[in-house]
Amino acid sequence: MVKISCNKVLSNHSGSVTVVKYNSDGGYCLSGSSDKSIKLYNVSKGSMIHSFEEHGYGIGDLVSTSDNKQLFSCAEKQLYQWDIASGQVIRRFQNAHNDTITSVCVNLDSTLLFSGSSDRLVKAWDLRTKSINPVQILDDAKDTITSIIVNEQTITHNHSHGHGHSHGNNNNNQPHTHTQKEVITSSVDGCIRTYDVRMGTLVTYEDTIPISSVSITKDKKCFIASCTDETVKLIDIDSYETLKEYKGHKNKVYKINSCSNFDDSLIISGSEDNDFYIYELLSGKLLSKLSGHSNIITHVDSHPSKNQFITSSTDCTIRIWDQSE
């Protein structure tokens, strides 16, 4: 049995905390709030390092780059790129969308930024140029985009079984690798859409229940979808079969997210009943329902290499939860 308890409460925001995310190694976390600020914390110390205060509206989403040097954030129709060390805005994408921007995501090498909006569009921005226009627009969703993931992994094809003919060399025994790049979106229209950037294809998981967020397991084999029928669904990434449903938390109105822990043994979820829910991934069993927040838990995130979690709430606080020894 995994015992989890809250060991730190961060109370630096003066408004609802809409999002909280670890940086790539889990040493720091970033939060966004309706108070229009983004805050950077040292997780182990529980201390705030910096407050980013250039947005004119409440923060909808944020993401840091894999090298932890830059930050992207959205607020209403504003899309900003920040230098984390200096706290300065590097670039403003003014009026990037025609409606509120709900989600942002950046690829691994920080060359492409993706933004999703209530205008139903996903836009891709080339960070290597100063162009004010997106390089691509994905317009397949029928309703608000609720989350975006970039899934990049190296696929190895082993040709040692003698497929094809050898043309005077022996290279067909060498494994061939390519990087699969997928952009995955969820929407209020009940669909998860997977775009293969390399192949230019789209595959759609369709349901009638609005999806308030989608994440991906650490082994990249399953989607984790938070749905407004108060379920979290574990969906096979290849067959789109629903493998497991997790029930107990409350989610009918708000954008609430879920994700797996570092080793894919647990599923964690926010909830509208103010409690933090932890499920066993394989069995679907509810392991823990943790109290502490005094209002809706809007966002949860899992440390990349241990059982530590962060939660944000409309009670204006962030809580850090650790596994008890």
From Swiss-Prot:
Give the coiled coil ranges. none
Asked if Cytoplasm is a keyword of the record, the answer is yes
SMART domains attached here?
WD40 (SM00320)
Q: Which InterPro entries match?
A: G-protein_beta_WD-40_rep, WD40/YVTN_repeat-like_dom_sf, WD40_repeat_CS, WD40_repeat_dom_sf, WD40_rpt, WD_repeat_MORG1
Q: Which GO terms describe its cellular component?
A: catalytic step 2 spliceosome; cytoplasm
Spans through the membrane: none
Q: Where is region (Disordered) located?
A: 157-179
Cytoplasm listed as a keyword: yes
Where this protein primarily resides, as one coarse class? cytoplasm
Q: What function does the entry list?
A: Molecular scaffold protein for various multimeric protein complexes. Acts as a module in the assembly of a multicomponent scaffold for the ERK pathway, linking ERK responses to specific agonists. Also involved in response to hypoxia.
Which family does the record assign? Belongs to the WD repeat MORG1 family.
Full protein name? WD repeat domain-containing protein 83 homolog
The opening ranks of the lineage are: Eukaryota, Amoebozoa, Evosea, Eumycetozoa, Dictyostelia
- UniProt lists the gene as morg1
